[in-house]
Design a protein with these regions (language model features):
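Active-site diphosphate/adenylate-binding microenvironment
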Residues: 51-63, 392-469, 473, 479
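Thiamine diphosphate
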Residues: 141-154, 352-353, 361, 368-369, ...
Length: 642
């Protein structure tokens, strides 16, 4: 359907299809925020820097034609191989860009659209912007149903794209051309809003995409979305400062909001001025350099003994840009002091008020600097400082022991792989991971040296995120070496975007650890009475269980077949050489290493705090009975902070 041209088309309007108008509009959207340091000029960048796409009948003649006609100067196009992976790549780009620049993703209708759901959930949970443009069924319904349409007997206006509603921060379906104008503006508002941002979905019926309309020229004017830095309320700030001054054992928890706000320097200034120790969530790690005296490492179930011991005795917890997930709070068992109080600095009121806290609803950088000024002259007791610094030194010795590999001729453990990588990377390298046993080891062991070096997606902990995210990070930071760390389980979930990295000439590096199964869940299964059932990649044994020989799968050959250069490392010595070569490589390179597993050789220190994974309330197998007894003992320590 094409809307008839009107005489006004010659006076301040432009005749374009809906898809062409959307692409043109996106090419003129910008964000602006002040610089990362005082006195720096505001930085302006494209809000939507590029569009990923896989084309089918639901978008090829609409968005596809519009991208072709507009050209890369208006909207660069990136070709993906899997729709979920395209969202992961866009999310990696947005995170590396401090949420100031994002990417769009276009798909066809049907399975291409539903493949977006997992990536959308990841983006929304992590508060990272991505614009989703799935094709949709005909608005005019000339034939009903069309190819790949879901028929819902009780609702004719439902399509599979409605699956995206609960995982989107804004959802709209464009049934008419003129509806695009308010919808597109609302979409940009949400993407640029540090409180509301996440996945934004504009579902585009395939007939509407191709419909021509006379658009007002003002719709295509350059538009700047300014990202604010709201300051904390004066009364709340004074109350927070009083709480800090009264505390004897305060602890700061740095979350991802510190990075999103570029507040690392402000956090360091507060720690330097007051001596308050700083622990970090997975998203916040690297907010202080690992060698800063106040940095006590990761906190919670995957945290260090230093941070977790401080949390157990803290009488005041200052959360900065954190959501307090169960991994951070050890499932509500970590903050054990009977009188513990909370001060939460967060740009989102929803998060600032958690745990009955004194809420500082503000930008992290603005709030930290205001709190530092309010606390002028205040420092914690020297004995408290000396105690946590001594504990930090003891933990560093444990990290050294986990990294140590004195015999270069042996096959490495996972922690020795991390030690070898630690010795090779520089301050500007980026390390990406999301799932498996690596997040726990990295949170405890990795020595983060710069902002945005440590890139862990642990809001959704999505297997398959790492490789496409590495592509997005490399696009956002072309001068930084980017490493995706994956086990064989994660690799098998989503290796397809290796082809995209090869096509784009992006020199990402993959460290592929082969341990023949799901190591993390295998360990969790053993701890909860499951006896590692169903977690190994092995042939069936005589009893029908997967306990036979390892499967003869060559993942290194698979990576090579997709276009990567592959370096095989059988020993610690070969691993060090391969990592050095990979870092210098100018094309996609994979380092493949088979590791000794944690149940056969010592690795990273065990978990320092609990995580609530309910165990069978009744069972006949002794392992489950014993695991339930331990579960009941741990669960008794849970508490609500009121």
């Amino acid at each position: 359907m094409t809307t008839p041209a009107t005489p006004a088309a010659a006076r301040g309007t432009r005749r374009l299809t809906v898809a062409q108008a959307l692409v043109e509009f996106l090419g003129h959207q910008y964000t602006e925020r002040d610089g990362g340091r005082p006195g720096e000029a505001p930085r302006r960048q494209r809000l939507i820097a590029a569009c990923w796409g896989i084309f089918g009948h639901g978008n090829v003649a609409g968005i596809g034609q519009a991208l072709l006609e507009s050209g890369p100067q208006t909207m660069p196009y990136l070709q993906g191989r899997n729709e979920q992976a395209m969202v992961h790549a866009a999310v990696g780009y947005a995170r590396q860009s401090d949420r100031l620049s994002a990417q769009a993703v276009t798909t066809s209708i049907g399975p291409g659209a539903t493949n977006l759901v997992t990536g959308a959930a990841l983006a929304t949970i992590n508060h990272l912007p991505v614009l989703l443009l799935p094709g949709d069924i005909f608005a005019t319904r000339p034939a009903d149903p069309v190819l790949q349409q879901l028929e819902v007997a009780y609702a004719g206006d439902v399509s599979v794209n409605d699956c995206l509603r609960p995982v989107s921060r804004y959802f709209d379906r464009i049934h008419r051309p003129e509806a695009l104008i308010p919808a597109a503006l609302q979409a940009m508002r949400v993407l640029a809003d540090p409180v509301d941002t996440g996945a934004v979905t504009l579902a585009l019926p395939q007939d509407v995409q191709a419909e021509a309309f006379d658009w007002p020229e003002e719709f295509f004017a350059d538009r700047v979305w300014r990202v604010p830095r709201p300051a904390p309320d004066t009364a709340a700030l004074a109350e927070a400062a009083r709480a800090v001054r009264a505390a004897r054992r305060p602890l700061i928890i740095a979350g991802g909001g510190v990075h999103h706000s570029e507040a690392e320097d402000a956090l360091r200034e507060l720690a330097d001025a007051t001596g308050i120790p700083v622990a970090s969530t997975q998203a916040g790690k690297g907010a202080l350099r690992h060698d800063h005296p106040a940095d006590v490492g990761g906190i919670g179930h995957t945290g260090t003994a230093v941070a977790d011991d401080l949390a157990r005795t803290a009488d005041l917890v200052i959360g900065v840009g954190t959501r307090y997930t169960d991994f951070t709070t050890a499932s509500a068992t970590l903050f054990a002091d009977p009188g513990v109080r909370f001060v939460n600095l967060n740009i989102a009121s929803f998060d600032a008020h958690k745990l009955s806290a004194t809420a500082l609803v503000a930008d992290a950088r603005a709030g930290l600097r205001a709190l530092t000024r309010e606390l002028a002259g205040h420092r914690v007791d020297p004995g408290y400082t000396a105690g946590y610094r001594a504990a930090k030194e003891r933990w560093e010795a444990r990290v050294d022991a986990a990294y140590a590999a004195p015999d270069p001729s042996v096959r490495p453990s996972q922690s020795q792989v991390l030690g070898a990588l630690d010795a090779v990377v520089g301050d500007q390298d980026v390390i990406i991971n999301a799932a498996g046993s690596l997040p726990g080891d990295l949170h405890k062991l990795w020595r983060a040296r710069s902002r945005r070096q440590y890139h862990l997606e642990y809001g959704y902990s999505c297997m398959g995120y790492e490789i496409p995210a590495a592509i997005g990070v490399q696009l956002a930071a072309p001068d930084r070496p980017v490493w995706a760390l994956v086990g064989d389980g994660t690799y098998l979930m989503m290796p397809t975007e290796i082809v995209t990295a090869v096509q784009e000439g992006l020199p990402i590096k993959i460290v592929l650890l082969q341990n023949h199964g799901y190591a993390s869940i295998g360990g969790l299964s053993a701890a909860t009475g499951g006896e590692r059932f169903g977690t190994a990649y092995r042939f069936r044994d005589a009893d029908g269980r997967f306990t036979g020989d390892p499967l003869p799968v060559d993942l290194a050959a698979n990576a090579a077949s997709l276009g990567m250069d592959v370096l095989r490392a059988a020993t610690v010595g070969e691993l060090r050489q391969a990592l050095t070569a990979a870092r210098a490589a100018q094309r996609p390179t994979c380092v493949y290493v088979e590791t000794r597993t944690a149940d056969t050789v010592p690795g990273a220190p065990a978990a320092q705090a609990w995580w609530d994974v309910p165990v069978a309330g009744t069972a006949t197998r002794q392992a489950a009975v014993e695991a339930r007894a331990d579960y009941d003992r741990q669960a008794a320590a849970r508490r609500r902070h009121l």
